[in-house]
A protein has these predicted regions:
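Class I (Rossmann-like) S-adenosyl-L-methionine-dependent methyltransferase catalytic domain
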Residues: 3-74, 78-130, 148-155, 167-231
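A conserved beta-strand element that flanks and buttresses the S-adenosyl-L-methionine
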Residues: 140
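Short catalytic micro-motifs in class I SAM-dependent methyltransferases
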Residues: 143-147
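Conserved helix-to-beta-strand junction in the class I
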Residues: 159-163
Length: 231
């Protein structure tokens, strides 16, 4: 049905309808947001799996391929979902050893069914990563860290610093108003904060942090890559 509507309506009308629905979700969810609680159950929904197959096309999925172009060694996809990016990187980085982890066994099973090696996938909360120190050369996440609680973000960064030897790359939405708008919710809860908020988080552990524009955006956020190096 959605595809039919997209084919029938002109782009301006689609944009307007999407914006109306987006604002509706923001207002509807304001009273029900729990500050210290993540929306985890959403990851076991087939609709979520379908969205994860599509949302980064033409933007962030191209960007992670470019960022990791030519990189070798072990690379971890944090919150890998259905494994879409791992499969893309297998083509462009044939000499790399690609791993993925996700909190949802449902999504991990989909990744396994796509042919990703079982021993390279793990169902685990990213705040509890149990890989050895410097096990990976690189790690990355796309649209993931913003969904952790404030404390959870710090815990994930601590773990990624421990298990990554060279650099960790992360794409998140940041507030278009350049404000710390805090814990909010559209389809699921997330932090919609400014660039400095994220940089301060990463610099608690990583020595060097670069911020690069992403081509992704929505009605309240712009996408940014945070390139975090240990040296």
């Amino acid at each position: 049905m959605k595809k039919i509507i997209k084919n029938i309506l002109p782009p301006f009308m689609l944009f307007l309808l999407n914006k109306i629905y987006f604002v509706y979700l923001l207002n509807k969810n304001k009273l029900s947001i729990k500050k210290d609680s993540q929306d985890i159950e959403i990851y076991n929904d087939p609709i979520t799996a379908q969205k994860l197959e599509e949302w980064g096309k033409g933007s962030v999925w191209n960007e992670i391929v470019l960022l990791l172009n030519g990189k070798k060694g072990k690379i971890l996809d944090v919150a890998c979902g259905t494994g879409k990016n791992i499969l893309d990187l297998k083509v462009t980085n044939p000499e790399a050893i690609l791993y993925g982890c996700d909190i949802s066994q449902f999504l991990i099973d989909i990744a396994k069914n796509k042919g990703i090696d079982n021993d390279k996938l793990k169902c685990i909360d990213a705040t509890k990563l149990d890989y050895e120190e410097n096990f990976f050369d690189y790690s990355y996440s796309i649209g993931s860290l913003e969904h952790f609680t404030d404390e959870g973000v710090d815990q994930v960064i601590d773990k990624l610093y421990y298990v990554t030897s060279v650099a960790s790359f992360h794409m998140m939405p940041v507030s278009k108003k350049n404000k710390n708008e805090g814990w909010t919710k559209t389809y699921q809860t997330f932090h919609n904060n400014n660039i400095d908020w994220w940089v301060s988080k990463f610099k608690k552990k990583f020595k060097t942090v670069y911020v690069v524009d992403s081509s992704w955006n929505d009605f309240i956020s712009n996408g940014k890559w945070f390139l975090c190096y240990k040296k």
